[in-house]
């Protein structure tokens, strides 16, 4: 089972089909329009576990969470939902002992009405699972996570994910608060990208104060705000106006030029960020040029998706960018995700691993 953004089930299904085939796991996706999730039915026993274990979750763009489904319950009685779940799971020898329990719903308005019930149901379910030996007495972050996903009040999927290969967030969604002084809501996209792409223990070295950053298409400053909050200095590139609150920090330089033509005077930039409304292939190529020239060491950027053929466009743009970097002998790590705060776009992160002299 994979959670995704409502309306992106088709893209999520295409992706899991491709990735499963690469691992020689065969099956078919079951897609329900606007359901906020996709089910991938494996033909062979044990293959769902193989995917949960071996399919790199971070390599999936459109999935917010993935777990192996052990059982589906379609008509749980409202007076006792626990007993049928325990009875069925007790028969499954391969079900692992878990270290955490998450009772969730897909991210749709209809399903989210069940969240209040999910919260209430968590304590009795946790006690019952512990009593049955399916859940450890104490939480253990290294053990698998037990997932119970309710799509209706009597209909749920029970399964598990591996803690080294899942999203650590409930429902796969980081809970971020919009800062009152940020110039636009887009600020949450970059904050979420930091949470998703950069391990927390590396924030002090990779997102440290005193670094220089460039924000292409910066106005009014939603992404710049995140960099300024981390005490960086920022070249803001946009023909529009920046928020006064950011100008007053003394940490930004505003360049009123086209983002495609800007070149930093001093080549001391660590971070390049970009949220320009532009053709995705053009943005991806521009990011590649910056990295190849050694003008930035890390980048986070958005690729706006077309109305049709979204998955194909994403694959093509990322493949072209990877080829461009490899041909220019750049070693790199690339991740891409359809973030919670993204709409018709995906967010890409690239860290350059080569030592490139700016030129």
Curated annotation (Swiss-Prot):
Keyword flag Secreted: no
Single GO BP term? rRNA processing
The keyword S-adenosyl-L-methionine belongs to this UniProt entry's keyword annotation: yes
Residue sites binding S-adenosyl-L-methionine per the record: 186, 219-222, 238, 258, 275
Q: What class of enzyme is it?
A: transferase
For this UniProt record, give its keywords in alphabetical order, as a comma-separated list. Answer: Cytoplasm, Methyltransferase, rRNA processing, S-adenosyl-L-methionine, Transferase
Gene3D superfamilies annotated for this entry? 3.30.2300.20, 3.30.70.2810, Vaccinia Virus protein VP39 (3.40.50.150)
State the reactions this protein catalyses: cytidine(2498) in 23S rRNA + S-adenosyl-L-methionine = 2'-O-methylcytidine(2498) in 23S rRNA + S-adenosyl-L-homocysteine + H(+)
An example of a GO molecular function for this protein is: S-adenosylmethionine-dependent methyltransferase activity
InterPro entries from the UniProt entry: RlmM_FDX (IPR040739), RlmM_THUMP-like (IPR048646), RNA_MeTrfase_FtsJ_dom (IPR002877), rRNA_MeTrfase_M (IPR011224), SAM-dependent_MTases_sf (IPR029063)
Q: Which GO terms describe its cellular component?
A: cytoplasm
- From the Swiss-Prot or TrEMBL record, state where the protein is found: Cytoplasm
What does the record give as EC number? Answer: 2.1.1.186
Please give the positions of the paired cysteines in each disulfide bond. none
| Top-level taxon in the UniProt lineage | Bacteria
Cite the active-site annotation: 304 (proton acceptor)
Q: Where is it mainly found?
A: cytoplasm
- A single Pfam family it belongs to is RlmM_FDX
Family the UniProt entry places it in: Belongs to the class I-like SAM-binding methyltransferase superfamily. RNA methyltransferase RlmE family. RlmM subfamily.
Quaternary structure, per UniProt, is:
Monomer.
Q: PANTHER family recorded for this chain?
A: RIBOSOMAL RNA LARGE SUBUNIT METHYLTRANSFERASE M, RIBOSOMAL RNA METHYLTRANSFERASE FTSJ DOMAIN-CONTAINING PROTEIN
Explain the purpose of this protein.
Catalyzes the 2'-O-methylation at nucleotide C2498 in 23S rRNA.
What protein does this entry describe? Answer: Ribosomal RNA large subunit methyltransferase M
